[in-house]
Amino acid sequence: MMRRSRVSGGLAASCLCLAAVPAAGEVTVNLPAPTTPALGEIVAGTVPTVFRIGVDGSVTRISGDAVRLSNAPVTPPTMRLTCGLLNLANLCVVRNIRITMTPQSSGTVASVTMFHIGAISGTSFVGGAPADASTMNFQLTPMGLGVVTIQFGVDITVAPGQRGATVTRYTVNADFV
């Protein structure tokens, strides 16, 4: 039996938890507040512009000509995983967890184009930390009864001609393997 939690998070977007709860244990994914991280105001560029939000909260323009009006760092996104209290011996304590992170570009002027995984606490990666990717798919060792915290950064591509507050969305799924 697999347990799946699905959470949408965003940069200046709302976090939404969509979880079907079977009668087994569960993994709950908590993402940052709706404004974490927020790039702030952007002045329009003439070509697509990529901003990198590092796992430390630093913001760097990698390409393009849009301008971020603030030089301040942002709060880096942090994912927290917790396990429900039912059937822990069969699931949370002994089963690996697969995490899938996917950008959602529909209805936004900016999109997440790359995920960067940083520090992890409470468990470890199966097979080592994942490489940066546009869609992230990796496994964690069993988390037991504790809380797992994963810091990550993102690359955000802002479309040409866009200005104002930048909104992006992404989805995180957690499944027992």
Kindly label every feature range from the protein language model.
Residues 23-106, 137-177:
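N-terminal small/polar-rich segments of proteins
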Residues 7, 99-101, 107, 122, ...:
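Intrinsically disordered/low-complexity terminal segments and short unstructured peptides
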Residues 19-20:
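N-terminal signal peptide c-region/cleavage motif recognized by signal peptidases
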Residues 122-141:
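Extended, solvent-exposed segments with strong compositional bias
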Residues 112-120:
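Short, surface-exposed beta-strand/strand-loop-strand elements in extracellular ectodomains
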Residues 1-11:
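Bacterial N-terminal signal peptides that target proteins for export
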